[in-house]
């Protein structure tokens, strides 16, 4: 083979290499991933950044944001990808308080956000909805597994002149139109005002742990439920809206990255409430770093 031929092949190889590099960089444009300011959101945003980096993307993480700030940043193009909750989008962003089933909520928010250039990908099985919880020993002692069981116990004790049933809720839930009052009406029980203790959400968990409350308002995937050995009560009449965690991406970003939707859907398919509760516990109770917990999950799920 002559030097001229070798040079010719070398130039061809260089051209192919540059073309392939250019293709890789086109996919690997910088993706800005946003997250809210609580543990679950820090985990979701961090695991998304690590996962996409392993797929060849450049990523920038901007988490620790409030709900409305994150939403505004997504709409204005300052963020490319976030994880948001279907119930939040329905009630907070779109001010719809109709009682819809989980699939109806998902379809509604997806439809409403499409004209805004935002695409809701496949929802995960992580439902971080409101939930009432009890100390497990108390729940087992009184055979309470659901909100209807709770209502029946309260009504039975009231007839017998039993002791008060202290319920801990946050300040908003106690008074809002889709809060405590309508829930009591649906399940057919009524607590006296003195039995309803309004407090910071974080204090509810501590009070439940110490059995200072009979029951308290929590979030279904909070790590403290497992860490403090609390019993979640089934919402057997479907009072609370679903808050399914879902990747939301700007449509422009999806168009520039043809495989991104499929890749994020693959991640979403691996996440459910039980899994996230355990991950949240590792951060909040066991004090493990968010980045480590996120990386462990991705490896165990076979995603990286």
Predicted features by range, described:
Residues 93-121, 210-212, 224-238:
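Ligand-binding "clamshell"
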Residues 40, 172-189, 258-304:
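An extracytoplasmic/periplasmic, membrane-proximal ligand-sensing/linker region
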């Amino acid at each position: 083979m002559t030097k001229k031929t070798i040079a010719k092949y070398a130039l061809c190889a260089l051209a192919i290499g540059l073309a392939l590099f250019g293709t890789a960089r086109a996919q690997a444009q910088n993706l800005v991933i946003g997250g809210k300011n609580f543990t679950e959101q820090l985990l979701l945003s961090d695991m998304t950044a690590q996962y996409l980096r392993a797929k060849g993307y450049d990523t920038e993480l901007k988490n620790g944001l409030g709900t409305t700030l994150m939403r505004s940043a997504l709409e204005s193009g300052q963020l490319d990808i976030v994880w948001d909750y279907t119930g939040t989008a329905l009630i907070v962003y779109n001010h719809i308080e109709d009682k819809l089933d989980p699939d109806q909520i998902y379809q509604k928010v997806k439809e409403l956000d499409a004209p805004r250039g935002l695409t809701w990908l496949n929802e995960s099985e992580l439902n971080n909805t409101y939930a009432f919880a009890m100390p497990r020993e108390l729940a087992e002692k009184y055979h309470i597994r659901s909100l209807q069981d709770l209502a029946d116990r309260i009504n039975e004790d009231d007839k017998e002149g039993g002791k008060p049933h202290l319920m801990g809720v946050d300040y908003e839930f106690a008074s809002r139109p889709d809060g405590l009052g309508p829930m009591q009406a649906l399940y057919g029980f009524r607590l006296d005002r003195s039995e309803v203790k309004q407090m910071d959400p974080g204090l509810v968990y501590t009070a439940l742990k110490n059995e200072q409350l009979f029951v308290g308002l929590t979030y279904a995937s909070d790590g403290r439920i497992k860490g403090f050995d609390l019993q979640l009560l089934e919402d057997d009449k479907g009072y609370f809206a679903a808050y399914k965690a879902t990747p939301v991406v700007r449509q422009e970003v999806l168009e520039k990255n043809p495989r991104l939707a499929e890749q994020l859907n693959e991640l979403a398919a691996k996440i459910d409430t039980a899994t996230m509760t355990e991950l949240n516990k590792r951060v909040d109770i066991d004090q493990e770093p968010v980045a480590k917990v996120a990386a462990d999950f991705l490896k165990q799920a076979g995603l990286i």
